[in-house]
A protein has these predicted regions:
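Cytosolic juxtamembrane N-terminal segment immediately preceding the first transmembrane helix
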Residues: 1-37, 42-43, 51, 55-76, ...
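Extracytoplasmic gate region of multi-pass secondary transporters
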Residues: 42-44, 287-342, 398-403, 439-440
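Glycine-rich segments within core transmembrane alpha-helices of 12-TM secondary carriers
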Residues: 176-202, 216, 333-337, 427-440
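Helix-loop-helix hairpin linking two adjacent transmembrane segments in secondary transporters
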Residues: 186-234
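Cytoplasmic helix-loop-helix junction between adjacent transmembrane helices
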Residues: 145-188
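C-terminal ends and interior cores of transmembrane alpha-helices
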Residues: 121-138, 363-377
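Cytoplasmic membrane-interface "Motif A"-like loop-to-helix N-cap segments
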Residues: 108-120, 349-363
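Hydrophobic core of transmembrane alpha-helices in multi-pass small-molecule transporters
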Residues: 126, 140-157, 298, 380-410
Length: 490
């Protein structure tokens, strides 16, 4: 009897449910990678929009009236260019934060496939419109601000929808590890966005936006044709979101050994109730832990997004790299973020303490940020090492809160399997965090003219505040480890 080929054996060793779950992970990973890929170019292009023109060789046939700004792109050729960059960032981030609070409620009530597809197509349009300003020779600040604001609104379609989709397919077992790996799409998108933008930034910076815009629009088409929102839509088995016991400590993990690609279904899976109404905004706020983690993410995301938008310019100004080199070097921060997100998920799965894991990483991040500012420019090896460490410690808690914590709270035991709370809870947490994401780059734009030291002091303060906001949850988790019974709210 002839044996099956090894590849076929591998394929048949997994169940139909497992292959669908795997495909959902891959698809949603690609979708949100494209979202972040389309956000990153602005941070790379900043150092091209305003340069030190005295070091640039100008064409012989060009009539130059101002030797200091002839190579800059108006209106960013002014002395207050850093403030203008801050305004530009804020147009996107304020619109994103505002829209996020409503996006979750739309996501609960609209088909996720249509919602995501339309969001990605519109994001591609507005990203490309920013780059077309180069070819259309647009020098109006209002044009770029309007495009950024509209892009910020449509980009809110992404996060609540992909988290809700993954939450529909995966139960609580090993959720931190699965989502820690899956959440690397944020850093992968930032890295790809930096590299793609870096290819065109010195020659035709408009393509730094147009190419990512085309990519995210194409992923929107893929989403429309291939996304499956729920296991029930294709007759797959829904996941188990809760333990069978009556009481569940706040954000403690199941001790069951649920496998990612299990080919057998447990008989202990509780039946999924068919809720006809999505959870209300106020109802989501009453879920234990939502307020604390939302406020913590506000400050954690403030730090992360300040790096996202200002790190290439900081490296270019302080370490004196050209725009492409600064953009390439800044990707190391995101490489560290990938490792940090996976480690945060693993540690929180093993310990059962989501809040404690976030708290520990944030408290270590504060002195590391201080060191980065002091010694981060002392040679390339030091810069690389500090970027990796700071990326892991800053983005680790941010990744854990926006993925595993959001999914845990969105399928909390008090909801009894109502996964229609997932999108709203995720939107509340990420929307609150996005307020910090809007404030951070704006403050950096206002503070940076007084010196980069002051920017880092602001970031360290935000890190410490994020730690303090988790203190109550950390205390409850530690008491649980010591054998005390935690009393649930709600």
């Amino acid at each position: 009897m002839r044996s099956l080929a090894p590849g076929i054996k591998l394929i048949t060793s997994f169940s139909r449910d497992s292959w669908y779950r795997f495909s959902i992970l891959i698809l949603t990973f690609v979708f949100y990678t494209s979202y972040h890929l389309s956000r990153k170019p602005i941070s790379i292009v900043k150092s091209q929009l305003h340069r030190n023109c005295s070091n640039v060789i100008h064409p012989a046939d060009l009539n130059i009236t101002d030797n200091d700004t002839w190579c800059d792109w108006a209106p960013f050729d002014q002395n207050n260019y850093q403030n203008l960059f801050g305004v530009l960032d804020n147009c996107f981030l304020v619109a994103y934060a505002f829209g996020m609070f409503f996006s979750g409620m739309f996501g609960e009530r609209l088909p996720l496939r249509y919602y995501l597809s339309s969001g990605m197509l519109l994001s591609g349009l507005f990203t490309a419109l920013f780059g077309l300003g180069f070819y259309w020779r647009i020098h109006s600040l209002w044009y770029y601000c309007l495009v950024q604001a509209l892009n910020g609104l449509v980009q809110t379609t992404g996060w609540p929808a992909v988290v809700a989709c993954v939450g529909n397919w995966f139960g609580k077992g090993k959720r931190g590890f699965i989502m820690g790996i899956w959440n690397s799409h944020t850093s992968v998108g930032n890295i790809l966005g930096s590299l793609i933008a870096g290819v065109y930034v010195s020659s035709a910076w408009g393509l730094s936006f147009i190419v990512p815009g085309i990519i995210i629009a194409c992923t929107g088409v893929i989403c429309f044709f291939f996304l499956v929102e729920k296991p029930e839509d294709v007759n797959c088995t829904p996941p188990q979101h809760h333990e069978s016991v009556e009481q569940e400590p706040l954000l403690r993990n199941s001790s069951s050994n649920e496998e990612i690609f299990s080919s057998h279904t447990s008989t202990a899976v509780e039946p999924v109730e068919d809720h006809t109404e999505a959870i209300s905004f106020c109802g989501a706020l009453k879920i234990p832990g939502v307020v604390e983690f939302s406020l913590c993410l506000l400050f954690a995301k403030l730090v992360s997004y300040t790096f996202l938008y200002w790190l290439p310019l900081y490296i270019s100004n302080i370490a004196h790299f050209d725009p492409k080199e600064a953009g390439d070097l800044s990707t190391l921060f995101d490489v560290g973020g990938i490792v940090g997100g996976i480690l945060a998920g693993l540690i929180s799965d093993y310990s059962g303490g989501r809040a404690t894991t976030c708290w520990a990483m944030l408290i270590i991040a504060a002195p590391m940020l201080f060191l980065f500012n002091k010694i981060g420019q002392n040679g390339l090896p030091t810069t690389v090492g500090m970027l990796l460490w700071c990326g892991a410690l800053v983005n680790g808690p941010y990744a854990l809160i926006t993925t595993a914590v959001s999914a845990d709270l969105g399928t909390h035991e008090c909801l009894r399997g109502n996964s229609r709370a997932l999108s709203t809870v995720t939107a509340i947490i990420d929307g609150t965090g996005s307020i910090g994401a809007a404030v951070g780059p704006l403050l950096a734009g206002l503070i940076s003219p007084t010196g980069w030291n002051n920017v880092f002091y602001m970031l360290i303060t935000a890190d410490v505040l994020a730690c303090l906001l988790l203190s109550r949850l950390v205390y409850k988790e530690i008491r649980g480890w010591c054998g005390y019974t935690t009393r649930q709210r709600g």
